[in-house]
Amino acid sequence: MGLDMMQDNHLSAIPFKDNNRLSRTGTKMYVVNLMPGYNGIQYIAEKYALEKPVSVTVELVYSTDTFKPLKKNRENRVESYDFEINNAFDRGEIVGGFGYIEYTEPTKNKLIIMTLKDILKRKPDKASGEFWGGKKTAWEKGQKVEVETEGWFEEMCLKTVKREVYSAKNM
């Protein structure tokens, strides 16, 4: 498929303990799953698309930004959007994200919009606080304690929007 483990977020090797299989010595075996990351999903979607997009834009929308979707209708032949960053250095809280897929034939352009609720719906139930922010377990003075971490919330939201935009149903 052309994915490269040396590229960021292309392909990751994830080991799992397989409790159903035993080795000859009777110990549990491990299985390695090769999981494509969001850049790998993007690569596959663009490389194997029936109609290759000219450009794909993926952005997060913050509370101080101005975002206006322009959906296709009888007066507007091409789906599009207006997006303006009003305060680049203090954009506020994330309110959602969008992806815009542009084709050579403009009438095929597609706008995918995700609210913050849609993004958080895709967050795993047992998501690590280290990534999404929140509480994580740490060791301090030989004891397990829960600490609050900022995590990588923006990056996780952007990754989630990218996964949706580059999914098979949208490309």
Q: Can you say where each PLM-predicted feature lies in the sequence?
A:
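Binding-interface segments
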Residues: 1-170
